[in-house]
Design a protein with these regions (language model features):
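Extracytoplasmic/secreted envelope proteins and their assembly/folding machinery
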Residues: 105-113, 123-127, 144-151, 166, ...
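Active-site-adjacent structural segments surrounding the nucleophilic cysteine of cysteine proteases
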Residues: 1-136
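Noncatalytic regulatory segments and standalone regulatory/sensor domains
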Residues: 69, 200-247
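Short, well-ordered alpha-helical segments in soluble proteins
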Residues: 108, 112-116, 154, 173, ...
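Mid-length scaffold segments of soluble, non-membrane domains
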Residues: 120-123, 127-164, 174
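Solvent-exposed loop/turn segments at secondary-structure junctions
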Residues: 87-88, 111, 120, 135-137, ...
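Extracytoplasmic/periplasmic, Sec-exported soluble proteins
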Residues: 96-105, 118, 135, 139-143, ...
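Active-site-adjacent substructure of cysteine-protease-like catalytic cores
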Residues: 157-207, 227, 242-246
Length: 247
């Protein structure tokens, strides 16, 4: 009788575990995909080849480390730099997705918020903030509302920029504003990818902070190329947003 009782208990426990696993799998399948698609970043999982151009001169920009925090120099201000593939948070969660694969949005906004407020917030913390506030799009990256939403959440000013006025974009960068860009297929991504425009050089080239590549972050870029490769969607004020600290 004792053996029978033990066998029944084990069988019941196994059945309960299987039932729980089946329930969780069912709920995952039933969870609706984000809509509308036009308002989603639509990331890709394939790595982009390194840019076919040399790293910029040390006198123009470089990546430095101070008190365990990385910064990109150049432009009007140093910028807090976070890489979504860094060991510290690559396997951290953005909702149920990995930061390394889907977290360019919160990583880009972590750089912007940390730089403009002076208070560090890392990709793990920003990812949780984005999940809590509805900016995470399961298996697709981020809703494009992430840029204006996060900026306002942290007391920053966010404006949608015209793609026709290159002088305005350069002026904003020269005066210390940061510009978040949602890129389409090209040098930065095969699908959709948030980067930060962080400065302009004397010859008019653009400095960027790419949350997926320190090499691309240390390369200068023509503004024409960046504008040509922006996402074609114009939802939620994108694909170009200027973010600044309030006066």
């Amino acid at each position: 009788w004792s053996r029978l009782s033990t066998a029944v208990t084990i069988a019941a426990d196994n059945a309960a575990v299987q039932l729980q696993n089946s329930w969780e799998e069912l709920m995952t399948r039933l969870e609706p995909e984000p809509e509308p698609a036009e308002d989603i970043q639509l990331v890709d999982s394939e790595e982009v080849a390194p840019p076919p151009r040399p790293i910029a001169s040390f006198s123009i920009t470089t990546l430095i480390c101070r008190n365990s925090q990385e910064y990109l120099t150049g432009g009007a201000r140093e910028l807090f730099y976070y890489n979504q593939t860094a060991d510290l948070w690559a396997e951290g969660l953005y909702g149920t997705d990995s930061i390394s694969g889907y977290g360019c949005g919160p990583t880009a906004m972590a750089m912007v918020v940390s730089t403009l407020t002076g208070t560090p917030i890392d990709p793990v913390q920003m990812s949780q903030h984005c999940v809590d506030n509805g900016y995470w799009a399961r298996r697709q990256g981020s809703y494009r509302t992430i840029v204006q939403g996060v900026a306002e959440d942290f007391g920053l000013v966010c404006e949608s920029l015209s793609l026709e006025d290159q002088d305005d974009i350069s002026r904003r960068l020269a005066t210390g504003q940061l510009v978040v860009a949602l890129m389409g297929p090209g040098h930065f991504t095969n699908g959709g990818h948030f980067i930060v425009l962080r400065g302009v050089t004397l010859d008019g080239s653009i400095l960027v902070a790419d949350p997926a590549s320190s090499d691309r972050s240390l390369t200068t870029w023509e503004l024409d190329l960046i504008l040509e490769e922006l996402s074609a969607s114009r939802h939620s004020g994108g694909p170009l947003w200027a973010v600044s600290a309030p006066f």
